[in-house]
Amino acid sequence: EVQLQQSGAELVKAGSSVKMSCKATGYTFSSYELYWVRQAPGQGLEDLGYISSSSAYPNYAQKFQGRVTITADESTNTAYMELSSLRSEDTAVYFCAVRVISRYFDGWGQGTLV
């Protein structure tokens, strides 16, 4: 069973940056797509981007280009998402979700409140 464990809640100031982690257990980072999404209060899910084992570069949602950085450390089965130049509207719960290639989402993190 795929399980994702995210880092804890963050209290940050406007203009600063936040970096959160997502550690996977139950499978190894060999063939996957790891997504980051967020949910602001009263809003639906919003995609930030994803990283794939089949590509050398992450894919970022256009809205967050230049502010978001997604990386993965395959040696520790951990993915990271950093969001910079934070604004009040970035207040949300941030989730990671993994899809093993050719399957639906196999696991979700519990969320990180920012």
Curated annotation (Swiss-Prot):
Pfam families, per the entry: V-set
Gene Ontology, cellular component aspect: extracellular region; immunoglobulin complex
Ig-like domain mapped to chain residues: 1-106
Entry keyword rRNA processing: no
Keyword Iron-sulfur annotated: no
Superkingdom, natural source: Eukaryota
Cystine residue pairs: none
GO biological process, one term: immunoglobulin mediated immune response
Keyword set, alphabetical order: Adaptive immunity, Immunity, Immunoglobulin
GO molecular function: antigen binding
Note from the entry: Antibody isolated from ten mice was exclusively of the IgG1 subclass. There was no heterogeneity in the heavy chain V region sequence.
Annotated PANTHER family: IMMUNOGLOBULIN HEAVY CHAIN
Protein name, as recorded: Ig heavy chain V region
Species classification: Eukaryota, Metazoa, Chordata, Craniata, Vertebrata
